[in-house]
Amino acid sequence: MKKLKVGMIGGGGGFFGKVHHRAISLDATREVVAGALHQDPALCAKYADEWGIVGYPDYKAMIADWQAGKLELDYVTIVTPNFLHAEQALACLDAGLPVMCEKPLCYTLKEALELKDMAKKRKKAPFALSHTYTGHPMMMLARELIKQGKIGDIRKVETYYNQGWLATLLEKTGQQQAAWRTNPKMSGISGCGGDIGTHALINALWTTGLGIKKVSARLTALPGRALDDDFNVLGELSNGATMVLTATQIAIGNKNNTGFRINGSKGTIEWMQERAEELQFFDGNTRTTYFQNIPVPEMPAVLQSYGRIPCGHHEDFLEALANLHTSLERKIRVLKGEKNVPPSYDHPGIDEGVLGMKFLVAAVGSSKKKGAWMKV
């Protein structure tokens, strides 16, 4: 089997570019071969050299070389701040290149809808959205159990994502990750909501298969911060069930504490990212644990350089992200006409991306009106 060739836009010097690179390389079926890794040409060349790939000063030059037959690419991964996603993804899709894009999908809902229209026109260029947690086998199992009716009719969904890294005005110190995430010109209309609230939303809706009708929200921020760092939403789901979503970046002591509890008429399913290899299924008075792992404590400083993932995640975080790349890879191989390709799982794509943007618009609008109900 020939390896798929992957290009990357952004990600140079950033922690998540490295995570994508490792996830792509985890299987022997894909490899990163080129990238426009940074807006600074000198740094772009530096990071490309570190990875041993062809470096480009900008993504347009990389696409042009692919179109001219000077570069072999099968898809592109976009790992840039939110405000750049639409322009870059549109350029790739317009050229016929499949895309794996970081979330949230875009800077504005208008951009998201334009991107969806383009994705529909380019049926031979699949589009994937990297909601990494949906790649965890236990979350995929939860989705299958719900589809099989194991918990009955869904009555209530609690979904959350707790972090503590923005409990102070870290962006004022020049910390790069904090600076762009709290800047409306780069992140969009919501900070915490766009960064991790969309994870909590898609984790819940993708797993249950439900939509969302309307929301009542309260968003707050530390004095001196331009965007929300605490994001709380009450929602009505498409079947009439209640969703309670909380996302915060000011919960001191939390790294990446995300998960959900889904209550049905016949049972309950619960999953926590910090115990990602464990899925709790409650059926009446019995509890089934599908897989149990031993939580890993914080590593001492001498061992931290051996970690390959963001703090607060388990090592299987790489495998979860790799699973999303595998789903996209399989779609591409089928479109190429390859035989005996295993079926691709239905991981998030353009529709979930648009839903996430509609959700943010409704939540921000509701919060501005003191929690008034807003349609999604």
Segment roles from a protein language model:
Residues 194-278:
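Glycine-rich, aromatic-lined ligand/substrate-binding cores of catalytic
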Residues 53-118:
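Beta-loop-alpha module in the N-terminal Rossmann-like domain of NAD(P)-dependent dehydrogenases
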Residues 13, 125-128, 133-225, 279, ...:
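Predominantly a Rossmann-like dinucleotide-binding segment in NAD(P)-dependent oxidoreductases
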Residues 34, 75, 156:
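Short, Asp-centered acidic motifs that coordinate Mg2+ and/or phosphate
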Residues 237, 266-347:
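C-terminal glycine/acidic-rich active-site capping loop/insertion
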Residues 1-51:
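N-terminal Rossmann-like dinucleotide-binding module
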Residues 1, 77, 120, 323-376:
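C-terminal helix-rich "cap/oligomerization" subdomain common to oxidoreductases
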Residues 57, 101, 107, 127-129, ...:
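Hydrophobic residues in well-ordered beta-strands that form the structural core
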